């Protein structure tokens, strides 16, 4: 049976082209369209589609409000279309907070010209998130920052990210699970790579880490260039640790998370205790910018077995070769488990290659990290 899709957009051109692309895939079927958020909510309740594609800026009711209402009444996998602007990035992150599973940049030119890459990407994303209807969840954390965290020696511009903290993200009451035990290894770096579903996963994990987290964290999230600064700023306002978009020359410091900038590659240079980040273009041959393999590979060279690494939810296999290099250096590699992933691609690639020592549910990754680094 075909996957039923509701297409929501106030642009008649975009509704038509998206519908044509979706219907061109035999496994997908557009069952209806909506021109605003209010109509989307009504049709979601009545038609119960398997997936909804949703614009953000619409009359009557915007996409973010529609996502909130749909998630409260008839939880459905939602794929957002977002403009590649700073405001578009912030709105997209709001939509993910509200419960949307993923987003795609809204590129009219690519859609209009029926470019193979854009067509294939849209079809794949719809198919991937359709499998997660049972996975649907409520918003992960308030975006209202609270309390000042302790001052850090991190050197930032005065116009940079605010040093604010938040209460921990709510944790669902899970059945009593086995207690974790530390391996006894010593670490100097934490490295986390992710893609589809990553913004929510990273928020769940990082908001549970204390300000005294004992070493630097490098984050590689597949995301457009205009999105990473907004995402880093949001995480920074919610977390007790500090989070910033990485800049070339940043000296890695304990208790600070560095998010790889979109459209660039992030590498680590120097030696443990005095390592710096190098932000480079990385060339056109790379499939992902940023690329998890690139950062993981450089971490293996500098920190060897002193890396605690994780591959989280995401499409494809980025991270597998980097994890292989880390494994050869004696580092620790964990993978997010299938049940808690939005897309079980990247973690599956690592697990199937025999590179991960543990496969963990998202809700327990932060707990496992704190045990492993001696904070719990």
Curated annotation (Swiss-Prot):
PANTHER family: PROTEIN-GLUTAMATE METHYLESTERASE/PROTEIN-GLUTAMINE GLUTAMINASE, PROTEIN-GLUTAMATE METHYLESTERASE_PROTEIN-GLUTAMINE GLUTAMINASE 1. SUPFAM superfamilies: CheY-like (SSF52172), Methylesterase CheB, C-terminal domain (SSF52738). One of its GO terms (cellular component) is cytoplasm. NCBIfam families: PRK00742.1. InterPro entries: CheB-like, CheB_C, CheY-like_superfamily, Sig_transdc_resp-reg_Me-estase, Sig_transdc_resp-reg_receiver. Keywords: Chemotaxis, Cytoplasm, Hydrolase, Phosphoprotein. This is Protein-glutamate methylesterase/protein-glutamine glutaminase 1. Its main location: cytoplasm. SMART domains: REC. Transmembrane segments: none annotated. The modification 4-aspartylphosphate is found at residue 55. Residues 4-121 form the Response regulatory domain. One of its GO terms (biological process) is chemotaxis. Residues 141-158 have a biased composition (Polar residues). It comes from Vibrio vulnificus (strain YJ016). Residues 183-376 form the CheB-type methylesterase domain. Residues 138-169 are annotated as: Disordered. One of its GO terms (molecular function) is phosphorelay response regulator activity. Its EC number is 3.1.1.61, 3.5.1.44. It catalyses: [protein]-L-glutamate 5-O-methyl ester + H2O = L-glutamyl-[protein] + methanol + H(+); L-glutaminyl-[protein] + H2O = L-glutamyl-[protein] + NH4(+). Involved in chemotaxis. Part of a chemotaxis signal transduction system that modulates chemotaxis in response to various stimuli. Catalyzes the demethylation of specific methylglutamate residues introduced into the chemoreceptors (methyl-accepting chemotaxis proteins or MCP) by CheR. Also mediates the irreversible deamidation of specific glutamine residues to glutamic acid. It comes from the Bacteria. Contains a C-terminal catalytic domain, and an N-terminal region which modulates catalytic activity.
